[in-house]
């Protein structure tokens, strides 16, 4: 699920200066005294076209080699570069800058040449070998970033918290302050029913947050047009981390995921020395290199420098277009079971953690003792059985904490599963969770597939006593 929109691509030229290609269009024939030099004009036009082709071919080759050289075709950590390697890489960057300057200096630029110049500005690097490619890619990354490089966020945040005691990083009971973040597209769904179920999933998240003292943000804006689709969450998370230093944990949750255990609480004390909490399996990640070893539909980031650094390292595969397409080929070649499609945020994170394990994994907690992400297909038809045999508050397969409708896409015009099955299953999941909320007020749904409700507890003259005696983890009746 993604959103984000203010561009941070400093490599993109606008009108005017900045080293981009000149934006003056060729003068039409007959509109100037210079038209008498038609032969010279045609010669320069042919030469300019040839130069544009050179730019396009050069940039395409550089991008392919840079991505392959940097990301690699294996999952081993790259050797640390020596001083000589760094010097060679710097020379490579200098050489390619010189070549592009020479090409740009000859003749004007039409729209195609301007587009090629933009690409060249983002990837002004050569790739004679893997070391030089890495140096060149690092140079390109400087031109595309989520935002200005921040290196002292922990210190800035500590100072802010000291200066603003009215905004502590903890809430009642000393619990860390959490901000749940979700989002959806700014326009209406292709399927009208999609908006209805989007409202239900949002209501479900609001209910859980209200019960557990968690703040919530539902974003509708595209904050970065380069990171659309799967990737839109990254710039949003960064913006929220920096805008809310009082928040200790940022919790991303896809719009198609629902809380289905309203009594379960995150065991945050378990994660004292970790900064990323994500559902997954160690064996699928490190032994099988599976593309579904982790799930980025629901995960938590600590608000700290480490998380900012990870976002910066995670984002470079995300810019839409050629870069994302080429990165997708590399991910498919290296992650088991991954279909051939453009780079997605989940595969990119898995690849990053595999290829740079020593750098990141000591701060990552791969959680599977409860369902921070629970795949819906194996859960929704077992809710009655769960209600018969178990109770809320468990969070695992007995009573899943989160049910995630991966592949359903209720807001889109297509999905991996029949839309009728998806909508029926989402209705069951919502009502299963909603019963846990409604019983606080003495009501319940007549059935898991019915929006209608019934009274399950009579009103009394001593409602406070009833409230105090209510156990949110008690079993829920399955009778209609």
UniProtKB/Swiss-Prot annotation:
One of its GO terms (biological process) is xyloglucan biosynthetic process. The keyword Signal does not apply. The keyword Transmembrane helix applies. This is Probable glycosyltransferase 2. The gene is GT2. InterPro entries: Glyco_trans_34, Nucleotide-diphossugar_trans. Keywords: Glycoprotein, Glycosyltransferase, Golgi apparatus, Membrane, Signal-anchor, Transferase, Transmembrane, Transmembrane helix. Belongs to the glycosyltransferase 34 family. Its EC number is 2.4.-.-. Probable glycosyltransferase that may be involved in the biosynthesis of xyloglucan. One of its GO terms (molecular function) is hexosyltransferase activity. Residues 1-21 have a biased composition (Gly residues). Residues 1-49 are cytoplasmic. It is a single-pass type II membrane protein. Glycans are attached at residues 74, 124, 129, 458. GO terms for cellular component: endosome; Golgi membrane; trans-Golgi network. Pfam families: Glyco_transf_34. It is found in: Golgi apparatus membrane. Residues 1-45 are annotated as: Disordered. The chain crosses the membrane at residues 50-72. Residues 73-480 are lumenal. Gene3D superfamilies: Spore Coat Polysaccharide Biosynthesis Protein SpsA, Chain A.
